[in-house]
Amino acid sequence: KKNNLDFAGLMYTESVFKSTIEVSPGPEFNFINNKDIQLLDEEYFIVSSNNRMGYFFENGLSPNNFSIITSPVIPGTIQLTPSGNMIALMKDGQVSGGYPRILQMNELSISILSQKKQGDKIKFKIVELS
């Protein structure tokens, strides 16, 4: 397969090495300002406390006092906390949340992120749904 890489005799899919995660705007994407939208182009460090429920990112956006009523979330939802940090919900994540849902990952992006560990860097690439 053309997308497989041979490394030390083991075959890996290219996604193991990717650090760019495609996301689409979430329902509350319009809550964030233009400065924070530009910050989404920066690299984000994955911090500790990651598990099958969620991944946490170090470089945050502006602190905020946004609140929404408890709303449904699905795997791949990226929520913005009041401190400006982001949480990416994974396969075993909760089913509802009260933080703004600013981004949404697709299945491939969830798989790429799930292969990352503490200290790894990722970048978001915002793609529009067609």
Language model features by range: what are they?
Residues 1-130:
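Conserved "landmark" site that anchors the functional core of diverse proteins
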